[in-house]
From Swiss-Prot:
Residues 39-52, 112-144, 188-225, 277-279, 325-342, 387-396 are cytoplasmic. InterPro entries: LysoPLipid__transptr_LplT (IPR023727), MFS (IPR011701), MFS_trans_sf (IPR036259). It is found in: Cell inner membrane. It comes from Shigella flexneri. It is a multi-pass membrane protein. Residues 1-17, 74-90, 166, 247-255, 301-303, 364-365 are periplasmic. GO terms for molecular function: lysophospholipid:sodium symporter activity. One of its GO terms (cellular component) is plasma membrane. Disulfide bonds: none annotated. The keyword Membrane applies. Catalyzes the facilitated diffusion of 2-acyl-glycero-3-phosphoethanolamine (2-acyl-GPE) into the cell. The lineage of its organism: Bacteria, Pseudomonadati, Pseudomonadota, Gammaproteobacteria, Enterobacterales. Coiled coil: none annotated. The chain crosses the membrane at residues 18-38, 53-73, 91-111, 145-165, 167-187, 226-246, 256-276, 280-300, 304-324, 343-363, 366-386. This is Lysophospholipid transporter LplT.
């Protein structure tokens, strides 16, 4: 890995390109692996309510490791942290390929993802600064969503052909991400921090307190947590919605529908990069409310074309909503608790929201509530939550 103390802050520097490529391949593997593993669960006749449990063990790793991964990201060169994390993902995907319990293998991928996230976002503030940070976030989100688009579809299509081929493709993507990480320049870290677990937990709780007590960062944390909690729940809702509403039982169709959301988020992220700055973040809030309005309308559809269009609209609104909130947290968090710790706190909030929403969704499926009413109620509650957040933000 090349040694560098001073960074080229160009939006298209060599280091930024390496980060974007690594992010694409890593996110491609994450999304392909989800649908490949869901296909494996179906092939092995696991109950439907166990599907969200797969994601819950993944986000559980984020929550348990939250006090530690931020310091890891800040104490070592972030490119090396990303490389190690992608290596863990590779190991997890390979273990599922070789017949180890899919929940255990997916948990290992979750450990890698937990270590990866603070580094991948924290490095943006080191590779670029100021007005370019929102644009860099737009590039990162566009890369991630392009990977969601292609990875989700690849996972479903390959799983319809052969589940083992789909799992092997995921491992290959993670291997490519490890190689791309080699080309990220070695940036300055903050070594010398205590590695006592009690002290690290206390430090993390202090970072949580600092960010949650600040009005701007609390606003960002709540908004992104609600968005990603809702987003991951929607992915699983689609898996059950497709056969009920459309009468289609393959693995590929839910991935095509998820791809529509991904395309929309790319468009929305690009629009946010052009139209929203750190000083005008509140412009994104109406888009968040509209997500909750569109989801119930989507849930009532019975034809593919309207479903595609509405999911793309949900994606556009989502991209426009979440990118400015991410940038706000990174900018304010970098100055107060360090970029890595800020993202770790964000991950705790987002994954706690995911765990809660997935748990409620899994329980609803387990007790037999039909998927269409689940979708309607889910959208309505999301719209109310974002409306309440906007009202709170305007008053404070």
């Amino acid at each position: 890995m090349s040694e560098s103390v001073h960074t080229n802050t160009s939006l298209w520097s060599k280091g930024m390109k390496a980060v974007i490529v690594a992010q694409f391949l890593s996110a491609f593997g994450d999304n392909a692996l989800l649908f490949a593993t869901l296909a494996l669960l179906k092939a092995q006749f696991y109950p439907e309510w166990s599907q969200p449990i797969l994601q819950m063990v993944f986000v559980g790793a984020y929550i348990l490791l939250a006090p530690f991964v931020g310091q890891v990201a800040d104490s070592f060169a972030k490119g090396r942290v990303m490389m190690f994390a992608n290596g863990l993902k590779l190991l997890g995907a390979a273990s599922i390929c070789f017949g180890i319990n899919p929940f255990l293998g997916y948990t290992l991928v979750g450990v890698g993802a937990a270590a990866y996230s603070p580094a991948k976002y924290g490095i943006l503030g080191e590779l670029t600064t100021g007005s370019k940070l929102v644009k860099a976030n737009g590039l990162m989100e566009a890369s991630a969503i392009a990977a969601i688009l292609l990875g989700s579809v690849a996972g479903g299509v390959l799983a319809d052909w052969h589940v083992l081929v789909a799992l092997a493709a995921c491992a290959l993507a993670y291997g490519g991400a490890v190689v791309a990480n080699i080309y990220i320049p070695k940036l300055a870290a903050r070594p010398g921090q205590s590695w006592n677990l009690i002290n690290m937990t206390r430090s993390f709780l202090n970072a949580c307190t600092s960010l949650w007590c600040n009005g701007e960062t609390r606003f960002s944390l709540v908004g992104t947590s609600l968005f990603w909690g809702a987003g991951v729940t929607l992915r699983f809702l689609l898996v059950l919605w497709v056969p009920v509403a459309l009468g289609i039982t393959d693995n590929a169709t839910p991935t095509y529908l998820n791809a529509m959301v991904a395309i929309g988020i790319v468009v929305g992220a690009g629009a946010a990069a052009k139209l929203v700055t750190l000083e005008t973040v509140s412009r994104c809030m109406p888009a968040g409310i509209l997500i909750g309005v569109v989801v119930p309308i989507f849930s009532l559809q019975h034809e593919l074309l309207p479903a595609y269009a509405l999911l793309m609209l949900i994606g556009v609104l989502g991209g426009f909503f979440v990118v400015p909130l991410n940038a706000l947290l990174q900018e304010r968090g970098k100055k107060s608790v360090g970029a890595g710790n800020a993202i770790a706190v964000q991950n705790l909030g987002e994954n706690s929201a995911m765990l809660l929403m997935l748990g409620i969704y899994s329980l609803a499926v387990m007790v037999g509530i039909p998927v269409v009413p689940i979708g309607i109620g889910f959208g309505a509650l999301f719209a109310l939550a974002i409306t309440a957040l906007w009202i709170w933000q305007r008053r404070h």
